[in-house]
Regions:
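Structural beta-sheet core signal
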Residues: 45, 89-91, 127
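Conserved catalytic cores of phosphodiester-cleaving nucleases, focusing on short active-site segments
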Residues: 32-64, 77
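Acidic-basic catalytic patches of nuclease active cores, encompassing PD-(D/E)XK
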Residues: 1-22
Length: 147
């Protein structure tokens, strides 16, 4: 869904690339979901997290359980920024009844701390909602991230 959103131009923040590669090895025994390469700027490392949890009104949250692997990915994205690359975490909210996103720190405090460290290191975070119907699910719009 996120790759389709990039290619179609829905994710405006990730445009202008000359090549898009999937599952590229990086960090410590990890693979980045998408690597965007550009003619005249450093590559952009894009990690995608699918989000389904909604507990409070119209607020989507991630994670829905403890994810040490997710925290590791954030630390590795921070390292990519330190090396001069761009790194972006995209939360794909696979439901149409949410209008804001937040990290569920009460479910996984370690992930919340890693998210805060990553943001402070320069990792960008985006959240995108989906249009969901019986026929399809499609990335549709940006959703604000609450701290």
């Amino acid at each position: 869904l996120v790759e389709e959103g990039i290619v179609s131009g829905i994710i405006a923040e990730l445009q202008g690339y000359s090549a898009l590669r999937r599952e590229v090895k990086y960090g410590t025994n990890s693979r980045i979901d998408l690597l965007l390469e550009y003619e005249s700027q450093p590559p952009t490392y894009v990690e995608v997290k699918n989000c389904h949890l909604r507990r409070d009104g119209r607020l989507a949250e991630f994670p829905d359980s403890v994810t040490t692997r997710g925290a590791k990915h954030l630390d590795e994205l921070s390292e990519m920024v330190r090396q001069g690359h761009r790194a972006v975490m995209v939360f794909c909210i696979q439901r149409s009844d949410c209008d804001a996103f937040s990290v569920a720190g009460d479910i996984d405090p370690g992930y919340a701390e890693a998210f805060s460290r990553a943001r402070n290191a320069g990792v960008e975070a985006l959240a995108y909602g989906c249009h969901v119907s019986p026929q399809e699910i499609k990335l549709s719009h940006s959703i604000p991230i609450k701290d």
